[in-house]
Design a protein with these regions (language model features):
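Membrane-embedded, hydrophobic transmembrane alpha-helices
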Residues: 1-106
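Core alpha-helical transmembrane segments of integral membrane proteins
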Residues: 23, 27, 110-112, 208
Length: 250
């Protein structure tokens, strides 16, 4: 569910802009977190509580809007404009031509490399601890308490959403991660939701690396090597998402 919410809203809009599937999936989480940040700032002003029933429908509507824009964009590119020119709608919309065997093999190899990178990144976390175990470090404890504060206070704004952690003072603190995780956590499942978010961020990391390299070079070997190497790096994801779990920085 986290990955769907992270990817789907931005993916649709990026595909409407003509980006490849890989780039759209890699960049989509930034779109989603940007939208969440805007909502988290606007909701207190509008006196709207931050909870799944108020935030997730907006993400869903964004995805639907993007899907509509993508459909119109594809229709326009396929028909040299929006005119049907006497062609039936079903025929005008058409079906994309199947990709060839070579292209299919390249895509399969690329996504296979991404899967390998994700497994390498996630293995220490999955093998080393149960999902219900809290990370025994000061930073993840702070952030998990931040999610708890949002569940109780219904305020995810970076301008005071974590006030309970600062003696009631409304200080600025980037709350994108806390706001997102609070949409999938209950009062008794903050630890589990936080740990699952680590896996989601690992997936975002390896896909994002492959997407970044794909726009920097046409080398297939470099594109496939990027997520595998990225999955084994010590600073990220090993340190940031397994050892110290500095989620907002990740």
């Amino acid at each position: 569910a986290m990955m769907v919410a992270l990817v789907l809203p931005g993916f649709m809009w990026l595909r409407a802009g003509g980006r490849s599937s890989l780039v759209a999936i890699g960049a989509a989480p930034a779109f989603t977190f940007g939208l969440i940040t805007i909502l988290s700032v606007a909701y207190p002003v509008l006196d709207i509580e931050w909870e799944p029933s108020t935030a997730l429908p907006i993400l869903g509507m964004s995805a639907l809007g993007g899907a509509g824009a993508w459909s119109l964009s594809f229709f326009r590119r396929s028909n040299d404009g929006f005119s049907l020119r006497g062609v039936p709608l079903r025929e005008a919309i058409g079906v994309r031509k199947p990709i060839g065997g070579r292209q299919a093999a390249i895509r399969a190899a690329t996504w296979g490399a991404i899967l390998v990178g994700f497994v390498l990144a996630a293995l220490p976390l999955v093998m080393g601890a149960a999902p219900s175990n809290p990370i025994q470090q000061w930073d993840p404890t702070f952030h998990q308490n931040g999610v708890h504060a949002m569940l109780y206070g219904k305020n995810a704004s970076p301008f005071g959403g974590l006030h309970e952690l600062y003696g009631g003072r409304n200080v600025y603190y980037p709350t994108g991660w806390h706001a997102f995780v609070s949409l999938f956590a209950r009062y008794d499942s903050v630890i589990q939701a936080s740990n699952v978010s680590s896996l989601a961020l690992m997936a975002v990391w390896v896909v994002g690396l492959a997407a970044l390299v794909s726009v920097l070079t046409a080398s297939r070997s470099a594109i496939m090597a990027a997520p595998i190497i990225g999955g084994m790096l010590l600073n990220m994801p090993a340190d940031a998402l397994t050892m110290y779990n500095q989620w907002p920085n990740s």
